[in-house]
Amino acid sequence: MALCGLASWLAACSSTPPPEVPEKCDLQIVTSAVITSPYINPSERGEPRPVQVRIYQLKSDVGFLNSDFEEVWKKDAEVLGEDLVKAEEFPVYPDTRTEVKFERDDAAQFIVAAALFRNPTGKNWFKSFELPPSPADGQCGARCPDGECAEGPVLDPRFYIWIDDTRVEDGIEYADYFPEGGTLSAAPTEAAQ
């Protein structure tokens, strides 16, 4: 009888341990591909010029949407206040594709691409993109080579930004027409407008 009790006790101790909980992702790399037409940021004589682009990581884009160009250009930290998480600035040139990769801050819910044009018009000088859930909100799982998984969240999001004249737009439709390191060719008809 004691032998049976010992056998039961050993069987209970040797049961399969519970599965390990996957570790949370602690890093998300965001890629922004800025694609420019040959006609960006025209000078007074109509010649294309390079333009500075700022990529903002924001908690909310409402303050940005309610701001004007001069406010953001001259005093972005003051205007955006606590919504501003991080900002990065770099030049882009006519008829090019520039890829910028950065680590997403967990507090950021939006990225905004803003071009500091010579003569901006209306609200066309920026484009806001909502970020997928923060990596801290989900499980890591397997990294996906193309940035998207068949099931589950986008682990490393990619955004395409199109700049033409003095406009910043969602550039996904131009991604295939301007390969990385290439020049603009056979763009959709909207590119010529």
Language model: regions and residue ranges:
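Structured domain cores in non-transmembrane regions
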Residues: Q52, Q57-K123
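Envelope-exposed proteins and targeting segments
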Residues: Q28-V30, R49-V51, T96-T98, Q109, ...
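Short amphipathic, basic-aromatic surface patches that mediate peripheral association
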Residues: S32-E44
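Bacterial N-terminal signal peptides that target proteins for export
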Residues: M1-A2
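Non-catalytic, glycine-rich low-complexity segments
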Residues: P19-S32
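Bacterial signal peptide processing site
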Residues: S14-P17
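Glycine-rich, aromatic-bearing surface loops/beta-hairpins
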Residues: F126-Q193
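C-terminal motif of bacterial Sec signal peptides marking the signal peptidase cleavage site
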Residues: W9-A12
